A protein has these predicted regions:
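Interdomain/boundary linker segments immediately adjacent to catalytic/signaling cores
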Residues: 1-19
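Catalytic core segments in nucleotide and nucleic-acid processing enzymes
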Residues: 15-172
Length: 172
């Protein structure tokens, strides 16, 4: 029926708005609370051998944190499910992992001529699911983390979680 369709569309639009709000909250938090870190939502250029990239999508990061020679690219994810089931086993969303890996490797290549360390993080809003991804992987010389941010707590605890990410990554 129309009412069911409207509800589904509204739920979808609300989820899109929440996702964007989640991304902006994290970005603005780091801008305000860590002025020594450059926090932006930078585009990452494709590193093409032939220079032909007309049909390639723009690589737009949600959050890119830079401090000295370290860069952390954060892809903020606000989903109702932080994992997907594949053959009866909980797995990370493969598209998300491919995306952050692509961002990191292209940024790494862009900075090849200067000292740098590029890492990536998928930062999911924590859900009530039993399995909560909090892992770290080393892929082709880069650290890729998957973390959750618990939003169902006092703001001081949310701030502490975000602070830990910056402090651990940038040795602050």
């Amino acid at each position: 029926t129309n009412s069911e369709g409207s509800t589904r569309l509204m739920d979808f639009l609300d989820e899109q708005r929440m996702c964007r709000l989640y991304e902006k909250f994290i970005l603005e938090y780091y801008r305000r609370e860590f002025p020594q870190i450059t926090a932006n939502a930078a585009q990452i250029p494709w590193q093409l051998d032939d220079g032909i990239g007309m049909m390639l999508p723009v690589m737009q990061s949600d959050i890119m944190l830079t401090y000295k020679e370290k860069i952390l690219i954060i892809d903020a994810k606000y989903y109702s499910h932080t994992t997907q089931t594949q053959y009866g086993t909980k797995k990370l969303h493969s598209g998300n992992l491919y995306q952050i890996f692509t961002y990191v490797k292209n940024k790494e290549y862009e900075l090849a001529d200067c000292p740098h360390e590029v890492s990536g993080m998928l930062l999911y809003a924590k859900t009530d699911e039993e399995i909560i991804p909090n892992n770290q992987y080393f892929m082709s010389g880069n650290k890729i983390s998957v973390r959750t941010l618990d939003l169902d707590c006092d703001f001081t605890e949310i701030a502490a979680q975000l602070n830990r990410i910056a402090e651990e990554h940038f040795d602050l």
